[in-house]
Amino acid sequence: MWVADMDFQTAPEIQEAIRERAAHGVFGYSIVPEEWYQAYMGWWEHRYGFSMEKEWLVFCTRVVPAISSMVRKMTTPGENVLVQTPVYNIFFNSIVNNGRNIMESPLRYDENAYQMDFEDLERKLSNPQTTLMILCNPHNPVGRIWSRD
């Protein structure tokens, strides 16, 4: 990465502040401002007419930790989590590493595109031990964008 060369040295106070922050060792998002929550909730309200409470939200900086958090919060150990295969392999880790079972509903390849097998999906989701489905949209790796239809 390139930055402009300055005509003068950086102030000692700035250098020290950078050293102190670097010594902390955590470089991700450590503070989530209230404005972020308001913007997120406002977007859902404006776009879909759906109101939510701030307490319902869990801020995550990446998809994989978010999926693992969702699996832990919405299921209990030993329950099944359904995924439509082929699917991003990290989903399997998020399920198994949290003590849950993988339930696969393979996608069908028809007419040059992947399709959901709704009969298989319904059968597997009717199992009382299958308590969560991870819907990947757009689907990775098949690239399919699922529509309401």
Region roles according to the model:
Residues 9, 67, 91-92, 142-143:
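Glycine/Thr-rich phosphate-binding loops of Rossmann-like dinucleotide-binding domains
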Residues 85, 104-109:
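Short beta->alpha connector loops at strand-helix junctions that form conserved
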Residues 97-103:
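A short helix-loop-beta submotif of the ANL/AMP-binding
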Residues 107-149:
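Active-site phosphate-binding strand-loop segment of PLP-dependent enzymes
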Residues 2-62, 69:
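N-terminal small-domain helix-loop-helix segment of the aminotransferase-like
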Residues 73-95:
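Conserved PLP-anchoring active-site segment centered on the Schiff-base-forming lysine
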Residues 52-57, 77-80, 129:
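Short acidic capping loops at alpha-helix termini that bridge into adjacent secondary structure
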